[in-house]
């Protein structure tokens, strides 16, 4: 039998970059940490239903509980050193539960919304906002109408407004959060760049120098053509 539930799909932003840079063991350790954090963020009847890669699917019969869970996730991951930013999608609608699996377009749309959300943000459908009992928990910023693959019609989407108390610093190579810059590796020439390790600094310099060298070659070739 179908019933209405709230769904949150929450992904780690930059997980592929982290895996590529620091390897499978570091990636697996990060997932273990993500699960521990998520377990401590659950509100009310919210529960983790399943994990696929770096995405966790949360479900609740009450949208207010799931929104509170999402806010906890953002707050706890933002302050976690050497972690990744999180992004997610929230939706409310009918699903079919069979052998502890959920089926229906509600699941698909929640996943599609999560895929569009930028790092450090949660986006939600108008159905989710309308289903909230207490809409004063936080503000919602309209992101306009969106089309989603394999979803009929346009959907009005909102961003959950989360007040940022500090500037978010991110390692440009592995995408890890730099919570305490005083303990990170500071780029000697670019003031705004911090790295989790000398490995990432060296990788950045290698890539940057390679791009700079290519640009110089292009400029030289263009100059020869003009002459």
Region locations from a protein language model:
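Catalytic NTP-binding/metal-coordinating core of nucleotidyl cyclase/transferase enzymes
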Residues: 1-68
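Catalytic core of nucleotidyl cyclases, primarily class III adenylyl/guanylyl cyclases
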Residues: 43-65, 79-106
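Short amphipathic alpha-helices in soluble, non-transmembrane regions
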Residues: 69-75
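Short, charged, amphipathic alpha-helix that recurs within catalytic cores of restriction-modification
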Residues: 106-113, 129-131
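Cytosolic regulatory/linker segments at or just downstream of nucleotide-handling modules
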Residues: 122-173, 180-181, 199
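Short Cys/His-rich "knuckle" micro-motifs
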Residues: 181-184, 207-208
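Short linker/helix segments within small regulatory modules
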Residues: 184-192
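Short metal-binding segments enriched for Cys and/or His
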Residues: 198-218
